[in-house]
């Protein structure tokens, strides 16, 4: 007599698997890197195979991709968008300008997106190739799979 297969896993692994395979980035394209980000969404690189669908609303997104030069005028707006995203949320800083201000070392440029929002992954380059953004997404998926989905300070009992 053949028995039905049994799948054993933890709730953490199950939640993290679902989260890592359904990342919906909020696109925040500001300069040249935005063109490379748009190319990543095209058919040649096929972001959809990772379960990734670009969203224009922060309330439907869990990943923010900051692509390009961040000015001080945009910083407050970007922070507001970040605050509107539901938890858990992650940030990818794409390109030298988003990482460190790039060649724009002026009074009007934020010298790194991490001064405004917490950044999880930094992509170097000017502008990073679409393959680099795909690799960053795979690294983020791995990071999500290894994280704790259930907070330790959560109540032990629901009733």
Swiss-Prot record:
One GO location term (cellular component): plasma membrane
Keyword RNA-binding: no
Assigned EC number: 7.1.1.-
Main location: membrane
Subcellular location field: Cell inner membrane
Cofactor binding note: Binds 1 [4Fe-4S] cluster.
Keywords: 4Fe-4S, Cell inner membrane, Cell membrane, Iron, Iron-sulfur, Membrane, Metal-binding, NAD, Quinone, Translocase, Transport, Ubiquinone
Enzyme class per UniProt: translocase
Molecular function in Gene Ontology: 4 iron, 4 sulfur cluster binding; iron ion binding; NADH dehydrogenase (ubiquinone) activity; NADH:ubiquinone reductase (non-electrogenic) activity; quinone binding
UniProt catalytic activity: a quinone + NADH + 5 H(+)(in) = a quinol + NAD(+) + 4 H(+)(out)
InterPro entries assigned: NADH_UbQ_OxRdtase-like_20kDa, NADH_UQ_OxRdtase_20Kd_su
Protein residues bound to [4Fe-4S] cluster: 32-33, 97, 126
Cofactor(s) needed for function: [4Fe-4S] cluster
Bilayer topology term: Peripheral membrane protein
An individual GO BP term: aerobic respiration
Functional note: NDH-1 shuttles electrons from NADH, via FMN and iron-sulfur (Fe-S) centers, to quinones in the respiratory chain. The immediate electron acceptor for the enzyme in this species is believed to be ubiquinone. Couples the redox reaction to proton translocation (for every two electrons transferred, four hydrogen ions are translocated across the cytoplasmic membrane), and thus conserves the redox energy in a proton gradient.
NCBIfam families the UniProt entry points to: nuoB_fam (TIGR01957), PRK06411.1 (NF005012)
PANTHER family hit by this protein: NADH DEHYDROGENASE, NADH DEHYDROGENASE [UBIQUINONE] IRON-SULFUR PROTEIN 7, MITOCHONDRIAL
Subunit structure: NDH-1 is composed of 14 different subunits. Subunits NuoB, C, D, E, F, and G constitute the peripheral sector of the complex.
Protein family (similarity comment): Belongs to the complex I 20 kDa subunit family.
Protein's recorded name: NADH-quinone oxidoreductase subunit B
Organism for this UniProt entry: Helicobacter pylori (strain ATCC 700392 / 26695)
């Amino acid at each position: 007599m053949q028995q039905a297969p049994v799948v054993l896993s933890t709730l953490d692994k199950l939640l993290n698997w679902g989260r890592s395979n359904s990342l919906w980035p909020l696109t925040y394209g500001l300069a040249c890197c935005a063109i490379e980000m748009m190319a990543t969404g095209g058919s040649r690189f096929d972001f959809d195979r990772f379960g990734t669908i670009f969203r224009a609303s922060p309330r439907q997104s869990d990943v923010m991709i900051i692509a390009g030069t961040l000015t001080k005028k945009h910083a407050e707006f970007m922070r507001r968008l970040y605050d509107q995203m539901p938890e858990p949320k992650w940030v990818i800083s794409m390109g030298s300008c988003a990482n460190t201000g790039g060649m724009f070392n002026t009074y009007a440029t934020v010298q790194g997106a991490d001064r405004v929002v917490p950044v999880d992954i930094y992509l170097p380059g000017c502008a990073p190739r679409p393959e680099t953004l795909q690799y960053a997404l795979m690294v983020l998926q791995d990071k999500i799979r290894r994280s704790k989905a259930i907070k330790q300070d959560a109540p032990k009992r629901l009733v």
